[in-house]
Amino acid sequence: NPDFQFEKYFPAIIEEARLLGREVTITKKDKRNFGRVESAFLKDTTDVYNLSFQTERSLRIKIEVDTNPPLSFATEQRLMVQPYSFMVQCMTLPCLFAGKMHALVYRQWKNRVKGRDWYDFEWYVRWNHPLNWAHLHERIVEFSGKECTKNEFIGLLNERLATTDINQVKTDVLPFVHHPRELDIWSNDYFLQLAQRIRWE
């Protein structure tokens, strides 16, 4: 919806935070001021907002709103019980997995690698979550402007997994990992074998 206005939700967000004892400010970021890396995966139809509030230390949450997202995704209602019970509509895990795989294969970071994409890929496979091909296909076509079969995607994925410098992947993800020894098994071959375990839906 190109006419979507996230700003109309600001008062409700601010009020909910106030009821929890937090004073928040929400500002819209100007995409023209983004660096090359930050803007590498943002579309023209994505608006970015910063939500900031003070706790023991200052905290900022980045919110991205895509007003023209790739379709063919599924959603589900999930119950949240903190800070009080409420229902939230969210994308299903197989569709989130599709978004992660699109990022892993197509994200261009020049000389950098986003190790968190690899960590998440491992998580989805280890927990046996299926990957939604319909949504992944929509993302690929929107991003590249070209058709892509599942087998072609698997070829691109295997190429990325086989040729990426795993030490760079580990270095990027290390600050976010509680037990660094769990990365000892990481190698190109390890990720290629994980890819063989992907369940498609």
Placement of each model-derived feature along the sequence:
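Structured mid-to-C-terminal alpha-helical surface segments
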Residues: F4-E201
